[in-house]
Each structure stands twice: as C-alpha cells, then as structure tokens.
Amino acid sequence: MKMPVIEKIEQLHDEMVGWRRDLHAHPELGFTESRTSTFIQERLQSFAVDEIQTFTGTGVVGVIHGRDGDAAIGLRADIDALPIAEESGVPYASTKAGVMHACGHDGHTAMLLGAAKYLAATRNFKGTVYLIFQPAEEIGGARQVVADGLFDRFPMLRVFGMHNFPSMPVGEFHWRNGPIMAAANFFEIRITGRGAHGAQPHYGIDPIVAGSSLVSALQSIVSRTIDPYQAAVVTIGSFQAGMAANAIPAEAVLKGTARWLDERVGETIQQSIRRIAKCVSESYGASAEVEMHMVAPTTINDEAAMSLARNAATAVAGAAGVVEMVQPVMGGEDFAYMLGVKQGAYIMLGAKRSDSVNPMLHHPSFDFNDAILSTGAAYWTKLVEQQLAV
C-alpha cells in the first residue's frame, strides 16, 4: 500500500512532466537562466508559497512556513544547462542551438517544484522550508551563492541536494557517508613556441610536438605520483593548435580536468601539472603557462544528515531501494560549497532506462527519465515532514 504523500505526489506527475519538458526545450547556461528563473517564480507564486526571493542574479528561493516552529531546512535543485548540441531527437528538444539540458537539471527543477506545490498545499510540518533553485552548477556557481550570503539571508539547520544518475537502477536511492563526489578542477596549458613553414621546421619551435609529449607525460601523475589506494583522475579533453597543414603554429592550447577526493592528493596533482608542463615545454625550447580553475571541492556528506536523508528515501523506496555506495563518484558537484559551511547530505536517484538506449550524463542524446519525477518529489516532501515533524 502506498503512503498518502506518495499518492498525492503521483497526482502531480503529468504536471511535473510538462514543466520538465518546457524547461528542457528552453535551456540556459549558468548565470543566464533568466527565462528559467521567471518560470520558477511564476510557478511558486501560483502555489501560494509565503515568499519568493532572488539571489545571485538568476537564483530563486521559495519560502514555505509550516505550523509553529523555528527549525528550518533547505532543499536545493540546480537549474542551468550545458553548452552541448542536442541529439536526443525528442519532440521537446532544445530550441537553442548548442545548448541543452544534458545533466537533468530540468528534471531536478521540476521535482523540487512538485514538492513545493505539495508542501504549500498541505503544510504538514513545523518550521520553515527553503526551496533553493541554484544557478550555474556546471561552472561552480554555488561558490558565489555562498559568498553572496545565501545562508545568512535564509538561516537553516541543514541543506540537502539530489542528482539523477542514469547508470543506477531507476527509482533506487544511492547514498554514502563522507566523500560522495570528487573535487573538480579545470586547467588550461598554453604552450608558446615559434611559428615556421612546415617544410622548414628547424626555423621554428613546434608547440604541437611539445604538447603531444606533454599529454603523455601528464598521464604519469596518477600512475607514478599518487598512492594507488587514492582515487585520482587527470584527463586532457582538448588540444588546439594551428589552422594550416603546411605551417607550424606559434602556440598550442591544452585543456583538461583533474579530480580527487583527498585534498593532499589534489595539491600534489596541481603541483605536478605545473611542473611537468614547464619542464616538458622547455625541453623542446618552448614555454608554458598554466591556469587552473577550481569548480568544486570534494562533496562530503555529514553522517547525521545522511541518516535523515536515508530515512526519507526508505519511506519512499523501501529498504531494498536504498543502497549504500561502495565507491564515490569521480564527477564533481558544486553543492560541496554548501556542505562546506552547512550540515547536509547529497543523495543519488537512479534513472536508468529499461530500453537499450540509456545515454549517460553530458551526452548529446541524454534526456532526463520522467519516470523518477514523482519519486524525487516524494523524497523531498518526506525529508521535510520527517525532520520538521508536527
């Protein structure tokens, strides 16, 4: 027999699907989510939430007061899209060239809106819930959100986050105490050589040759510098140089990402990237400049908050549907900035499709699995009703 909260949430399923697909068709990149922000505010207003406030440009917080009580918690959903050209072929595909919801933030937003509608109508809790619709997750926007004083404006005991994962069985909640997602660092290496005619390479300093050696040399960081028992990743995702087949360019640019769980490992990786880039480039007579951008630190769950999250997940999916993760995920999540200053927990919600086509996150053919909308919204509502119980 289904719990009443789940039955009521399921009645909102078709409405959540409509919201999700509208958002999917109109994706917006980080800190430019103006239409998305307006969409969220209009829905919250129609639900008669107590307050609607904006923050950090396009961010939105909906405030719902329950019955008497001073306690408060926050529920966070990310709202931004990615600079990826969509290839899903769905009728509601992106209408914006080169931009799509390839990470499911359209679904995250729809689930939190569904929870908002239920909570505003029932108010079966004591205290206050803050519905946090956060911009720019893909580029580390939570850092600015925290710096702008989100938790000063909206004081709360704990904050919770959730993400869909198409690699996990649909409807299952996956959890882990401590580190659950890796720190994410982006880096750019600019190698400067000297241009020359392709038939006269001796007059130049070839940054492509230097860069090619550098790509290989960087692989030694994880295999020869990091303890094998520590998780770490160094990936080069972009190598750009030159335009002509018969010309040696003056410059080559490599872009990549590094991931780690332990901060000491992260320091070693960053120092190694700088050292190897300098030494390899100079060995070819070139020079290298390295720029690094920290997207997010390691996402670390608080054990007590995670216990509360597990209880809510169990109420929705049953004990068999709540699975402890053996390993963290090496993807990054800027919710880590919120967990760095506020007790809270981050949980995964399985979204694997039953058919053979099941694109992963950030794939051009990815489309959020609408089958989990009710599950995610029910989780949010149970989290509120259990922690702020009447």
Which stretches of residues belong to each language-model region?
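Histidine/acidic-residue-rich, glycine-tolerant segments that coordinate divalent metal ions
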Residues: 61, 82-84, 88-100, 106-107, ...
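Short Gly/Pro-enriched turn/cap motifs at secondary-structure boundaries
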Residues: 52-53, 177-181, 327-329, 337
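Metal-dependent amide/peptide-bond hydrolase catalytic core
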Residues: 212-390
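Active-site pocket-shaping loop/turn-to-helix segments
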Residues: 26, 202-209, 263-270
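Non-cysteine beta-strand/loop elements that form the S-adenosyl-L-methionine
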Residues: 76, 85, 187, 346-351
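Acidic/His- and Gly-rich active-site-bordering loop/insert found
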Residues: 2-101, 110-125
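Divalent metal-coordination and catalytic microenvironments
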Residues: 23, 62, 75, 105, ...
